[in-house]
Amino acid sequence: MRISELRSRISDYFSDPVTYSQDIVHAELGGITVNQAIIRGDEPDEIWKAVVRHNPEMPDKFR
């Protein structure tokens, strides 16, 4: 997965993807945000898996 696909998936599910990516801290990412994980060099598919784990109510069509 590329970063652009990660951002697209986040945009598809969250009404404010920019705020979600910069403000929501994920224990699944070690206590950092999506943007910080990207900067750190985490693989986009691993970041997406963490987002899904962080949001268990996410419908299957977005997973």
Model-derived features: positions:
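C-terminal alpha-helical interaction appendages
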Residues: 1-63
